[in-house]
A protein has these predicted regions:
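Conserved NTPase motor "head" modules and their coupling/switch loops across ABC/AAA+ ATPases, GTPases
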Residues: 4-7, 119-292
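A conserved P-loop NTPase coupling/switch region
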Residues: 47-56, 63-137, 177
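Nucleotide-state sensing region of NTPase/ATPase domains
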Residues: 1-68, 74-76, 80-92, 156-162, ...
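Intrinsically disordered, low-complexity acidic/polar segments
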Residues: 25-27, 50, 115, 182, ...
Length: 295
């Protein structure tokens, strides 16, 4: 850790290093975090993009703060899904980053349109059409990746919750898409596995989802202009956690919520371990690192 000394033009910074062996080869990973600047990364002492380090050292951390996965707002659960998606498929880091950039650009444009009129407003609306298309394409990819992950994670969460809690209630997950809600599609009953399978299947076709998002953005255009917010897309979706047939948020006890949050992290670990075994070379798989804080 480096702190800014009086009279010196050096920002606060910290360096994180990890030495590990992957595929029988030693690796040195370094990330330099600099206050007010972009992070820097090195792989085996050679400069690289931070995204290039993703997936090399797969790590799962459980901490008491993870109770927010059950209790808090949808953005916490979306971040959980997206972090795990990128850990499993590092190539999707670019899709996630591009999506967030386009979303921010579109948000800024919507806010700016409130102050525009005449030809300036017409020009801004034409630009909005361009951002709509880009956002729809990127959001569709992100949604499909999340749904695939939820399907992979679901049995591991159920198993991990049983192991942790020894309870009779079964843990379950459901991905809720703002796109389908905006198009009048009701959420199925959590007990109806066939209906949920159909619901999720409708989100796996990236081209179809992109087209549907673009159409829905057009239908919501006036409301978005009035409110200056993006009303539909991956950024409005949620992951609902169930114990039995009831959502854990609002119905589960503190102990049940704690066990479910831990089960989510343990399930992530088991999923990555299973994936490592499937993609191993010469049958030699490498387990991810599991860190449990205050369990």
């Amino acid at each position: 850790v480096r702190r800014d000394a009086s009279g010196q033009n050096q920002p606060n910074a910290a360096v994180i290093r990890a030495k590990l062996i992957t595929a029988a080869r030693p690796q040195l990973l370094e990330v330099e975090i600099i206050s007010g600047k972009a992070n820097r990364a090195r792989l085996n002492r050679a400069p690289t993009r931070p995204t290039q380090l993703l997936g090399i050292c797969r790590t799962v951390l459980f901490a008491p703060e993870d109770l927010t996965l059950v209790r808090s707002d949808p953005q916490v659960r979306r971040r959980f899904l997206d972090d795990l998606v990128v850990m499993m498929s590092p190539r999707l880091a670019g899709v996630r980053a591009d999506h967030d950039k386009v979303l921010a650009q579109r948000s800024g444009l919507l806010r700016g349109l409130k102050r525009k009129s005449g030809s300036a407003r017409a020009s801004a609306l034409a630009t909005l059409d361009v951002w709509d298309e880009q956002l729809a394409q990127l959001a569709a990819q992100l949604i499909a990746a999340r749904v695939k992950l939820v399907r992979q994670l679901r049995p591991w969460v159920a198993q991990s919750y049983q192991t942790v809690s020894l309870a009779q209630s079964q843990a379950n997950l459901a991905y809720r898409a703002s796109l389908l809600a905006a198009r009048g599609v009701a959420d199925p009953d959590i007990a109806d596995t066939g209906a949920w399978e159909d619901y999720e299947n409708s989100l796996l076709d990236v081209q179809a989802t992109s087209k549907a998002l673009l159409e829905t953005m057009g239908q919501l255009r006036q409301r978005e202009l009035e409110r200056a917010v993006n009303l539909v897309g991956a950024h409005r979706d949620d992951l609902t956690l169930f114990l039995g047939h009831l959502p854990a948020k609002g119905f589960a006890s503190h102990g049940e919520q704690w066990s479910l949050a831990l089960a989510l992290r343990l399930a992530s670990f088991e999923l990555m371990r299973a994936d490592s075994a499937l993609t191993s070379i010469d049958g030699k798989s490498e387990d991810p690192i599991l860190i449990l804080d205050d369990v």
